[in-house]
Amino acid sequence: MAIKGIDHWVIVVRDVAHTLEFYRRLGLAIAWEHRPGRPDMPTIRIGDGQKINVHAIDWPDRPGYLGARRPSIGGADFCLEWTGTVPEVLHLLERSGVTPEVGPSTRTCARGPSTSVYFRDPDDNLVELTVYPEP
């Protein structure tokens, strides 16, 4: 037995609706998971088997909350793989009103060398979109 991969991670935000709209404009699917006996969970779906759960900063005050002991806004830094080209990444960001912070620049990601563009989401989390070279 071994760890297989990442199922999900959490970002902590000020305004759930605003954050979900931001990621929707970037082409990600938004879903609300209905959990019996617990509040619904907003999620940002990534492909078939990964997601980002979205927690509001005040959720630790809710009964039954299970999450970070000291959640913080803007504390996330993550990389998402883009299936298109770097110019397409730049066009998507421009069309979405997002200003790149760094890039395009060469980086080493999980599968090796890639080209990345970095930007901030509405809560100041650092988001990296990376493009691997064609084989």
What annotation goes with each model-predicted range?
Residues M1-H18, L26, A76-F78, P133-P135:
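N-terminal beta-strand motif that seeds the catalytic metal site of vicinal oxygen chelate
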Residues M1, T43-I44, A68-R70, T108-C109:
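Short secondary-structure boundary/capping segments
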Residues I11-P60:
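Core segments of cupin and vicinal oxygen chelate
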Residues P39, P60-L66, V102-G103, C109-G112:
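A short, acidic/glycine-rich surface segment
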